[in-house]
Amino acid sequence: TAALTAGREDIFTLSMHAEKNFPVRKARSTLDIALPDGTGDDAYLSTLEAHLPRVLDEFGPDVVLYQAGVDPHANDKLGRLALSDEGLQRRDSYVVSEARRRGLPIASALGGGYGTEPRLVAERHARSMIAMAQENAHYGDASQK
C-alpha cells in the first residue's frame, strides 16, 4: 500500500508493524509505527489509540481503507508481534468505530497471515470480518441518509 501511494499528499497511510518483520526494507508509509518484537494486545492497542484518532481528525479523509492483516497474531510465522484472537478483534472493532463515529465510510481488505495451519489463518480472517461487521452494525446504513 505504501509503495502504491508514495508521494500522494491526498492519501495518508498508517502502518503499525514489528520493526524487524518481513520485508526488511519496507516502503515508507506517511506514518510508520515500528513496535518491538513480541508486542501484545494492550501495548499494541494503546499505541493504535494514541495515533488513529489524531490521524483521522487532522488528515480528514473522505474514506478509510483498512488493511486488516492478521500477521500481528502471536502464532504468525512472520509478524513478530503477539496479539491474541481477542486482541485482533478489539483492534478491528476499534478501527471501524473510530471511522464510523466520524461519519466516514470504511472498506476493508484481508491481508497478512502466515501461519503453519491455513485453516487457523482463515479463521482469523473470518473473525476479523465478523468483528468489523458487528461494529459497523451499530452505526446503521449511511446511504439511507
Describe each PLM feature range:
Residues 1-145:
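A general "terminal functional-core" signal
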